Amino acid sequence: WIGPRAWLDNLDTLTIGNNVVISQGAMIIQGSHDYKKVDYPTYSKPVVLEDGSWVGAGAIVTLGVTLKSHSVLTVGSVATRDLEPYTIYQGNPAQPVRERVLVGTM
């Protein structure tokens, strides 16, 4: 599911697995500018959202990051590095806060 006002940068490959949630107002950022160079060139890196991962409302996933299987980036958090599977992350930069334990079946 992709929520309203979600921003998918589309500057590089974006891989979205099965049962992924990109909540309202979340941003997937794949590009930036090299501020060290006089001509300020752009560059990009792919982003991967593996099966069952969840990007919370208003959260930001930065370039080159992978949300591994069933990881969660909570509301308003910023992922600047890969998120480990079945782990819930919070903050800026996002830090692991607890394990994601799933119950039931799909």
Q: What are these model-predicted stretches?
A:
Residues 84-85, 90-93:
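Acidic, glycine-centered active-site loop in nucleotide-sugar glycosyltransferases
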Residues 1-67, 92-93, 97-106:
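Flexible, glycine/small-residue-enriched loop-and-beta-strand segment within the central core
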Residues 28, 78-79:
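Conserved sequence/active-site signature of Rossmann-fold short-chain dehydrogenase/reductase
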Residues 72, 77-78:
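A generic "structured core" feature
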Residues 70-72, 88:
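Alpha-helix N-cap/helix-start motif at helix boundaries, enriched for small hydrophobics
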